[in-house]
Every structure is written in C-alpha cells, then in structure tokens.
Amino acid sequence: MTDYYEPINIFRQCAISVKKRGQEHGLDVATRRVASWQRSAKLNSPTLRKVSDDYFLTKKVKSDYWQVSDMDLSATAFSSVGNLVMVTSNKDQDNVKLYTYAEDPNSMRQLQTITVPGAPITTATLLPAAEFNPTAYVPDHEQLLLTGHRDGIVNLISTSFTKGESRIVKRYNHRKHLVSMANEVMNIDTKHKDEIEQLLANHKQKSNSARAMPVRSIKPWNGMGFVSLINDSLFVFTLNNTKTPQYLNSFPGIQSFAIQTHSNPYLLGLTGTHFGANNIALLDLKKTLYIPDPVIDKEYRKSSSRSVSSDCTWISSCYLAQALGKEVNIWDVRRTDGKPKAKILPNKGVIEHLSYHYETDTLFSSDDQGNIIAWDLTNLDRLEYCGLVHGLDAVKYNMNLPINDSNYSQCGNVVVNGNNNSACTYRKLARKIEVNQRAGTLFSYCDHELGLHRLFSAPVEISLQLSDTETINYESEEEEVMVHVDKLHDNSHENSSILHSDSTTLHSRDFDSYSDNESANTTDNDNELAYMDTFKRPVPAFLDEKVAAYNNPVLSSSSSTLAYGYF
C-alpha cells in the first residue's frame, strides 16, 4: 500500500480523439493527411461556394404580365388560391373569369367564364378548398367563391371545372339588416332625438336605393363563414345561416379590416379615420362591442394625424402592419404606449394596399403611383426604421426622427417601378396585390393587366480589372497573402484606391507627402486632417510602407508588415 493518497480508478471517456502513431526508424512519427479544398471533387458544393470570392448572390425579380380584360372595362376585384386566379369585372355578361397558371413553363390559361346576374360586382374572393368543402353544397364541384354586389347582396357560388357548370347556392342580403338596425336605433330616448331621427330617415331613404349599399370588401373567416364591409357596417356571416349575421356593428370612418388567422380568428384589426390619432384599433368578437381609445403620444400625433390609413394586414399573432399615408407602421398589439414597433419610412406615393408572405417574412406594399416594394422583415425584432436598398431614398434620413446606423435597416426592394409607361401611372391607380402563400408568388392587378412576380436569389460573377498594379507577396509561417496595390500618383492631391485581399475598397490619400514637405499649405493640411478624422481610426502602418515600396522597388519580405483585415 502506498504512503500517499490515490484516487479511485474510474473509467472516463476521453474528451479528444488522438490518432495512432506509426513506427518509422525507431521514432514516433505522427501520420498526417494533407488535403486542400482546391483539389476536392466538391468544388461546386454550396458550402464551398459560400466562402468563395468569385461571385455573390443578389435578389432579382421576374415578372410576367397578361391582359385578362377588355381595354374599355376595368376589373373590380381579383383573388388567388393555389394556382387558381379569379378576376371580376363590371360587365353584365361574363363578369367572372377563372384562370390557372403554371410556373414551369410560365403560362396562364383560362378555365371558365361565369355570368353572375344582378347588380354589378364590386368585390369577390375565392374560398380555399382545404377549409371550405365545395362538395358539401353541390356534389362533384371543385371550388367555392363569393361575389359582392352594388346592392348589398353577397352570392355564394359553387363551380365545376370539369363539367363547366356553376350554381348560386346561397345568397346573403345585407341591406335588410341595415334598415332594421336603423329602425331600432330610432326608439332610443335622448335629448337629441329629433336630429338623430332626421339623420336616420335620410339613411333609410338612401338604404332603399341599390346604389347606396356596395359591398366594399369580403374575406374568408375561420373556415365557416366570411367577414364583409358595407359602407361603415361590419358583418360576420356563417355560410349555413343566411338570415341572421353572427356579428353586426357600425364603425364610422372605417377603411379596412384584417383577420388574425394565426391563432385567434376572433381578433380583427381595423383602420379608419375615427380610431384615434393612429387611425387603428382592435376588435375582439368574443368581448363586448367596445374599442378602447389608444394612448396618444403628442409628438407622434403631430406627424400622423393628417394621414389616412387605407389598409392593414397581420404579420404574426402579435404584429399588425398598417398603411398610413406614405408610411407603414408595424404595431405590437401587446404594447400600450401608443407607439409603433417599427416604421417603414416614406417613399414614393401614398400606400393603399398591403400583403404579407409568411414563409419568407416579406411585406409587399403598393402605392397610388403604381410602385410595388418588397420589405424583408426577417429581423423584425431588431428593426425600428426601414428604408429602400437602392436610390436616393435609401440614404435620405428624416432629421425629425432619431435614426442612426444601429436602428436603420435597408430592407426594401422595388418589385414594380411605377415610372414605366403603364395605365396605372397615367391614371394614378394603385396596383391591387395579393400573395399566394403556397407558391410564394405575388399577383398584382391594375386596370386590364394581371402581373405575376417572383423573387429569387441570382448569382453574379465578380470580375476585377486592375490596371497599373503591383503585386507584393507576403509569406509567413501560416499562409501567403496576395495584396494588390495601385500605383501612387505623383500628385498628392489625387485619390488612390487600395484593394485588399478581402475585396474591400478604401479611398485614401498620400498622407506622407504632406508630412515630408514643410512648405505645404496650412489649409491643405487642415483638409487632410479633417479627411483622416472621417475614418475615426489611426492610419494603418502599411500605407507608409506602400509609399516606400513605390520609391524603393526593392522590398524584402522580412521588413514588410501588412495590417491584414484592418478595415
């Protein structure tokens, strides 16, 4: 037994793996396998392409356009589900057309033409077959759709592509509910009863006219019904109940609504002129009919009270995007301070339509000048202000906002430029947009033109053409660095360009020419010092040695020191 403490011998797994050593001439020699990625057979693998410097990826857009209606008649609405597209017009005959498109090759083919009787169509939408079963109403039918008319009627239509037949299976009359609601309100006892009776009498007289009840918007709701907007009244109908709506309320000044389809379809976002200074409110269909007044910030009220909110869309279960004039505000519904989570700065025209693609976290906006812009909101949690990637608007800051490099992101790319010779530009019309969630494509419609837009990453090769350059080889124990240095001009006031091995371009000047020349002008020295201060860093040492390399062509590798990766 030993006279010192010895721990218990417990088996432990090695943390590292050591290769076996071979015996050569009685000495332990470690076997080493030298491999290079240049001799690898996977030169075209995605992993190696990411670290190479001969190309870079850029976002590009591919657009296809089709003429789907007559030049003298404009379409009233369009909708898309899967590879199916519907376009409606205000004609009496053939006012609903269904198309199908294929991505490879890009083609658009007309499936069916439907004539819906009654008043002109003002809006329409396709119902997803996965949520709304068309065979529950008519056997062997493949698609359900809703059409809203000028007289306040909404028709549920079932159609079959194979048989070529269509049928109106349900009809929802909104006008009669608005008239009965006005009669009930007239029985309210108030000191302003005479004025209210006069207003409601005028409202009732207008309600009897078919032209006073256009259906402004229709959206599918919770796989069982739809939400519709007529004038200032919001309806919620189930498809099986045509007599009584599940919900009905009037919101003066309402412009649009958005249904939260992620987790709570009973939560709606509303935009309008009477929803506080921010022109936005939340509506919970499960709670009492009450819209709380938001907390208004004085500074924010001055900048937003003059704008009109035209559209909104849900980004997630907590974030709601709102078009407010030329800006887009992204709200966090969990906050109560009355300030947006992020703001897309003003650009182009007044934004009228919004659409969001959930898989790629891309928000599309359309303005009254025919422009469509895609906003990358992947890092939404860290965003405060968003701007365009290209153009003068990308670098133009609003001096009234606390914008800096840390909270500003250039994430906007122009998909459709409104400066082209299109009908939307001449007539100042906004392109109606809708994202196909399954295919990830964007549909746009303006006047008679239907567009299909797709964003993709395209590789761009890098070709560097350097003239009058010298090559300095720097050898070390670990690697060999090749640095291309442009020749310095004799005129010290001219700029020279230095290209490092990491493809970073730095514009500098010949600083040593001023320090060696005692007769230099004081004004020039001040200008050069001010130019140096813009870098906010000390001048690298290799700039001095670069000048020495030009004056003395013989430069030993041992005396050169390169600040690799300094900038």
UniProtKB/Swiss-Prot annotation:
Presence of the UniProt keyword Membrane in the record: no
Keywords from the named record: Cell cycle, Cell division, Cell wall biogenesis/degradation, Repeat, WD repeat
A single MF term (Gene Ontology): G-protein beta/gamma-subunit complex binding
Sequence ranges of the WD repeats: 68-109, 127-167, 302-341, 346-385, 398-437
GO BP of this protein: cell wall organization; invasive growth in response to glucose limitation; regulation of pheromone-dependent signal transduction involved in conjugation with cellular fusion; septum digestion after cytokinesis
Database matches in SUPFAM superfamilies: WD40 repeat-like (SSF50978)
Protein family according to the UniProt entry: Belongs to the WD repeat DSE1 family.
Cited function: Involved in cell wall metabolism and required for the separation of the mother and daughter cells.
Entry protein name: Protein DSE1
Organism: Candida glabrata (strain ATCC 2001 / BCRC 20586 / JCM 3761 / NBRC 0622 / NRRL Y-65 / CBS 138)
